[in-house]
């Protein structure tokens, strides 16, 4: 590569003709960390841990499929003439919002089958979701994707980024904004805020809705910086969906407080979640 800058090898392990890419390793690591955190949260809320494992078994494949369907829908101009590419997910092309939609629908159906509260289940997994997203963005980093507009090395150095990040943002002869990093850091901050909020008196379901609002707010602005956005006419799909989710989540919070009066929850000094009224 020109300018003496070499990108990181996206392949973690090479066994003969089989390549294990860092993207897959990072995503798998994110799932494992998310599961361990969700199991810890379930224990605090006195929920059967097997419920979390069972949910994950269903949610992972459904989320992958829904993430792919979401992407294909908004890139239909390409896929309508290349139908065989639809199933070739290893060529790239999944969307986090599609995965979240699939995960939420799975959780809703799962909670009804198991006869448990969807909102309680959603609160348990909310911290896991946002930290998994924070970790997962580093898979995009290794693939040199999900970046922003062209910039200069001087600008990136002005952000006091380590050289390995700056060098990885050198793509096809130009430097680009590390929007993957902006979103990852936004999600880490959101994770910390969720951990703080859960130690306050909060109503059931509002930890999850708070996660949706926080993530969507950050995604709206970061999406505006990206160069690979899925488009719906002249609009960036993720920005439109972010606004809708923010409004919907706030509306649900208001409606549930006024009409349903859900119970309060908070952590005690030992880290256990106790119910308040």
UniProtKB/Swiss-Prot annotation:
Q: Identify the pathway.
A: Protein modification; lipoprotein biosynthesis (diacylglyceryl transfer)
Where located? Cell membrane
- Known EC number: 2.5.1.145
Looking at the record's lineage, which domain of life comes first?
A: Bacteria
Picking any one GO biological process from the record gives: lipoprotein biosynthetic process
Q: Has UniProt tagged this entry with the keyword DNA repair?
A: no
Q: What does this protein do?
A: Catalyzes the transfer of the diacylglyceryl group from phosphatidylglycerol to the sulfhydryl group of the N-terminal cysteine of a prolipoprotein, the first step in the formation of mature lipoproteins.
Q: What class of enzyme is it?
A: transferase
GO cellular component terms listed in the entry, alphabetical order = plasma membrane
This protein's record includes keyword Lyase: no
Q: Which GO terms describe its molecular function?
A: phosphatidylglycerol-prolipoprotein diacylglyceryl transferase activity
Similarity remark: Belongs to the Lgt family.
* This protein's name: Phosphatidylglycerol--prolipoprotein diacylglyceryl transferase
Cite the source lineage: Bacteria, Bacillati, Bacillota, Bacilli, Bacillales
Q: How does it sit in the membrane?
A: Multi-pass membrane protein
Major location category of this protein: membrane
Q: Cite the entry's keywords alphabetically.
A: Cell membrane, Membrane, Transferase, Transmembrane, Transmembrane helix
| Binding residue positions for a 1,2-diacyl-sn-glycero-3-phospho-(1'-sn-glycerol) | 137
Transmembrane segments annotated in the record for this chain: 18-38, 51-71, 89-109, 116-136, 177-197, 205-225, 235-255
């Amino acid at each position: 590569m020109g300018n003496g800058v070499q990108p990181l090898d996206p392949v973690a392990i090479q066994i003969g003709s089989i390549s294990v890419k860092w993207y897959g390793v990072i995503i798998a690591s994110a799932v494992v960390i998310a599961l361990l955190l969700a199991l810890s949260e379930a224990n605090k809320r006195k929920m059967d841990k097997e419920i979390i494992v069972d949910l994950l078994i269903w949610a992972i494949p459904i989320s992958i499929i829904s993430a792919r369907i979401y992407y294909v829908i908004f890139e239909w101009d390409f896929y309508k003439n290349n139908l065989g590419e639809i199933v070739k997910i290893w060529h790239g092309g999944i969307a986090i919002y599609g995965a979240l939609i699939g995960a939420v629908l799975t959780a809703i159906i799962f909670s009804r089958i198991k006869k448990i509260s969807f909102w309680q289940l959603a609160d348990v997994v909310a911290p896991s979701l946002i930290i998994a997203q924070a970790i997962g963005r580093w898979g995009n980093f290794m693939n040199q994707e999900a970046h922003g507009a062209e910039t200069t090395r001087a600008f990136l150095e002005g952000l006091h980024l380590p050289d390995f990040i700056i060098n990885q943002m050198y793509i096809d002869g130009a430097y680009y904004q590390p929007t993957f990093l902006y979103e990852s850091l936004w999600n880490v901050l959101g994770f910390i805020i969720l951990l703080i909020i859960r130690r306050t008196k909060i109503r059931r379901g509002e930890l999850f809705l708070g996660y949706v609002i926080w993530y969507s707010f950050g995604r709206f602005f970061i999406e505006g910086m990206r160069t690979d956005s899925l488009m719906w006419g002249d609009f960036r799909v993720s920005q439109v969906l972010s606004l809708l989710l923010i409004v919907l989540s706030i509306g649900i919070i208001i409606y549930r407080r006024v009409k349903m009066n859900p119970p309060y929850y908070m952590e005690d000094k030992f880290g256990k979640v106790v119910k308040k009224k």
